[in-house]
Amino acid sequence: TSDRRYRFNYHAVNALLARVYSYAGDSTNAIASAEEVIKKSGLELSSNNQDDPILFSECICALYKHHLTEALSQFWADGDKYTTQYFIRSERFNKYFEVSGNLKEDMRTKTAAFYEHSSTKTALSRKYSINSQEAIPLIRLPEMYYILAENTSDLTKAAKYLNAVRNKRGYSRSVNVQFTNAATQQAALDKEFRKEFYAEGQYWYFLKRHGITALSYDNAVTLTQERFEFPLPDAEKEYGWTASHDATR
């Protein structure tokens, strides 16, 4: 409801369970939890991101950040000649979001979602520059569909869950994806995770849990183990940590 805002409630618990069960390889419980959220949370997939590029209308729970816009403006809005902002080069943008020429069916690539700077050939996400909620999504509804798409053994049915999100985002049914095997299933999920959760962090976890070492849109990047491990804080080293602990991680 509107009263709860984006606090961690019953539906958020089920959404988190769906995520954890999926991570653990427990498809039965992952499916049950994801279906519970889709059927009973009252949220629906959106086909319009105008004035809501991060799609709070689909947000199950979020982390509040006081004065978020001001705190992040140098990265997502203001800045001196693109020296501080987290922009993406147009060439990589087109590969990342599968944009061909001027063809932009996907609303996640349009001007409501990205500001494109033609002279520098860069694009900048609007997710944190247009953010009246001052919140960072932790779990959004599309992830529940992706969990169903990943954990449903019937590949035809699994593809329908992925296409449900794609169709809402602007893709016509004529370009619906199909899964012929586990490899094509994962490849399609890879593409949708990176498009849907750009600048939200979820794609990093997708890459990590699937052990993906190469990016399909950037051959120059190799995902080594170091890219998936956060540096140990110095404070933890002061309280008994030794190098031998690495062997148990």
Task: Identify the role of each PLM range.
Residues T1-E91, E98-R249:
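Acidic/polar-rich alpha-helix caps and helix-coil junctions
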